């Protein structure tokens, strides 16, 4: 039985981590569907914590084999606010912020925006490092990916 089970709905916890900002970063996610858990992770040499948070969400949605109802839990206010509050305005403003500056990480925001149209996504914020089992596992996966990349 999966640790995060809700019948016929994918539950995912995502997290990004960075050693230095910018620096070596990793992302991790755990997806659960009908009692089966799947762990995914990856790392990059020169990145930021926000890029890794976005990558975790992107890779989570890319891992889905067909259109799904999915709830994604993140501890990133950047991701949560971006997807729920800022994205529509960025798109309407030609991918510029309210201050008329280029949106940071535009490439990843555009990819995430495209992927969210293929699924029924609910975004939920969870406090990081507060003992939440899913968030702790995603954080562990992100940091393990960094360790594997650096050989430490």
Curated annotation (Swiss-Prot):
- Summarize the subunit comment: Monomer.
Q: Which SUPFAM superfamilies match?
A: Ribonuclease H-like
Gene Ontology terms describing biological process: DNA replication, removal of RNA primer
The record's annotation in HAMAP family points to: RNase_H
Domain of life per record? Bacteria
- Summary of the function given for this chain in its UniProt record: Endonuclease that specifically degrades the RNA of RNA-DNA hybrids.
- InterPro entries noted in UniProt: RNase_H (IPR050092), RNaseH-like_sf (IPR012337), RNaseH_domain (IPR002156), RNaseH_sf (IPR036397), RNaseHI (IPR022892)
Q: Which GO terms describe its cellular component?
A: cytoplasm
- Catalytic activity, reaction form: Endonucleolytic cleavage to 5'-phosphomonoester
- Binding residue positions for Mg(2+) 1: 15, 53, 75
UniProt subcellular location: Cytoplasm
One GO MF term on file is:
magnesium ion binding
Q: Where does Mg(2+) 2 bind?
A: 15, 139
> What are its cofactors?
Mg(2+)
Pfam families named among the record's database cross-references: RNase_H
Q: What is its main location?
A: cytoplasm
Keywords attached to this Swiss-Prot or TrEMBL record, sorted alphabetically, are: Cytoplasm, Endonuclease, Hydrolase, Magnesium, Metal-binding, Nuclease
Family classification = Belongs to the RNase H family.
The catalytic activity of this protein is classed by the Enzyme Commission as 3.1.26.4
Q: Where is the RNase H type-1 domain?
A: 6-147
Task: Provide the cofactor note recorded for this chain's UniProt entry.
Answer: Binds 1 Mg(2+) ion per subunit. May bind a second metal ion at a regulatory site, or after substrate binding.
Signal peptide boundaries: none
| Name used for this protein in its record | Ribonuclease H
What is the gene name?
rnhA
- Its top-level enzyme class, in one word, is hydrolase
């Amino acid at each position: 039985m999966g640790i995060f089970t809700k019948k016929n709905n994918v539950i995912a916890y995502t997290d990004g981590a960075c050693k230095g900002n910018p620096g070596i970063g990793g992302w991790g996610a755990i997806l659960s569907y009908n009692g089966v858990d799947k762990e995914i992770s990856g790392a990059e040499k020169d990145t930021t914590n926000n890029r890794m948070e976005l990558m975790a969400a992107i890779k989570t949605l890319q891992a889905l084999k067909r259109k799904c109802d999915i709830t994604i839990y993140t501890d990133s206010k950047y991701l949560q606010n971006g997807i729920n509050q800022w994205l529509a305005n960025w798109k309407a403003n030609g991918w510029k912020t309210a201050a008329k500056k280029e949106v940071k990480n535009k490439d990843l925001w555009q990819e995430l925006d495209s992927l969210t149209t293929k699924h029924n996504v609910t975004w939920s914020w969870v406090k990081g490092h507060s003992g939440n089992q899913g968030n702790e596992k995603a954080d562990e996966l992100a940091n393990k990916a960094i360790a594997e990349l650096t050989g430490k």
